[in-house]
Amino acid sequence: MDIFIYSDESGVFDNIHNEIFVFGGLMFLSSKEMDDAMRLYAHAEQIVRKEEHLEDCCEAKASILSNKSKGKLFRSLNRFHKFGVVVTQRQLHKDIFAEKKSKQRYLDYAFKITVKRQFEKFIKEGKINKEESITLHFYVDEHTTATNGRYELKEALEQEFKIGTFNYNYQKYFPLIFKNLKKFI
């Protein structure tokens, strides 16, 4: 089984000037599902570009679109699997913001846990068979990679889903999700 994960982030991870930071994304449980979504979204985007008088070279960013156009784009993806997390920055420990790399480590953690919860939901609903051979395809838009942690994002995701993780502070093991994770792209 091929699972495709597309994600993007919005906001600035800076607790002094910003209140929230958001990750959002889509998961497709087959290449056909992904192709269908891309076709539907491309069609909706064409209509929005005409209505909003946007040039082809410009990205259709939410900050410049009308609510009607944003709604049209969102509705084009209604039947697909969406996920997201909102980070309320003032609730986080101030040490997270002390270094650029600690900030990135926290963002990687938030992303990893969000994706993990979505996989767990799909397994519980029977949409994913965790015993099946699985290839994960991650497409993370403009993601910074340097952290001050043990793993970069790719390694952290692979550790979480293929091997399992151990929290040394609490002496607790969190088991792997996919026994037969054959590829991680």
What are these regions (language model features)?
Residues 1-185:
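Phosphate-ester processing/binding pockets and catalytic centers
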